[in-house]
Structures are given as structure tokens and as C-alpha cells.
Amino acid sequence: MKIILNIFILIFILSGLTFANEVKIFEFTESELSKLDVRKVRGADNNTNYTVGSNENGNYLKAIANNAASGLGKEVKINLNKTPIINITWKVEKDLPGIKENTKKGHDFAARVFVIKKTGATLLSNRAINYVFSSNNEVGFNSPSPYTKKSIDNVLATTKENLNKWVTVKANVKEDFKKFHNLDVNELDGLAIMSDTDNSKLEAITYYQNIYFSAD
């Protein structure tokens, strides 16, 4: 009995270490959704419609953007020395074919997750990396936003390969801030989700699930 008890204690400790090395960002519940910071993009005609649901893998956020652009933000401190890897599970059901995403007229993404570092007193001074599920570009493509060089669009998934399929991707945020912004960032200040179609005037449907940071 003592041996069995010790085994259970060891399993519990190891499980605790595993969870300690993961930082979950969103629960995707009705209660959480009501508390998130909603920001409509200036000039957009409509807000993106966000709702929560669940499947066999847990809760998810569903986004419907019909000529719309608004994001859901959350202030959160992430220690990038301990957990530098962002993990995202997402699915694009309806994408945005034919647009040029690195131009102002086509700068829409069916799915994007921003990681944000405050580098000044105003929102405009912040630096961001915009991890996107592209409708037209290949995985690995990256470019500055056509609206500001302080935000970099980096393609982690594409509907050219995975339309209407759940995809799990990851990226080293600490390394990416150094690569794209030449910044040594030890701590993130916030994270945001957005599905937007205000430039193309099209409709996108996307699902987000299980967004967290990990050690590897």
C-alpha cells in the first residue's frame, strides 16, 4: 500500500510540474466572454460576432466576421523565459480567397492571435506579433502590417492546406520578438484574438480552442 501511495504522490508531483510549465490564456466560457476587452477596429462597419461552444476536446470560441472587425483582448503577464512557446488550436470553416493580405485593401485574416509587448505610454507605441491563419499565403510567410511596422504578420497555418480542419500550431514568441523587432522580451503584457473582414467586405467563420504558453 505504501508503494502504491508513493507512486500516486509521484504522479501528482509530475503532473503539477507539467501544469506549472503551461499557462492557459482563455477558458472560452460565457462568463469569460462577458469580461474580455472588446475593441472594434476604427472604420469597421460591424463588430465580429463571438460565441462560445464545446466539443469533445473542450470549449471553443466561434467567430463570424461579416464585413466586420473587432477583437477580444486580455491583459496577461507571460514569463517568456519560462514559457516562450505559444500553442494555438484553431479551424477556419470559411476563408477569404483572392485577397492580398499584406496590402491595406486586403489586410484581413480569418483568424489571428496577437501577442503584445508594451514599449511606451500609448497603444500606438506597443510592439506586436500577429500569428495568423492565412487564406492565401504559405506557412512561414511574414511581413509588417501595411498600417504599422510595429506589428508583424506571421503565417502559422493556411487554408490552402487546412480549410475546415482543426490545426494545432506553435511558435517561440521570445525568439520571434528578437527576429522581427530586435527586442529581448522577457515578459508579455497582453494577448488578443481577432477575425476581421472589414477591408475585403467578405465573410469568415473561425473557431479558436486551447490557446496556451508552454516551456517547449
How should these model regions be labeled?
Residues 6-15:
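Bacterial N-terminal signal peptides
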Residues 75-86, 160-163, 184:
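Extracellular/lumenal carbohydrate-interaction signature centered on repeated Trp-anchored short motifs
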Residues 50-71:
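Short carbohydrate-recognition loop motifs
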Residues 106-151:
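Extracellular/luminal beta-rich ligand-recognition
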Residues 20-43:
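Extracellular carbohydrate-recognition regions
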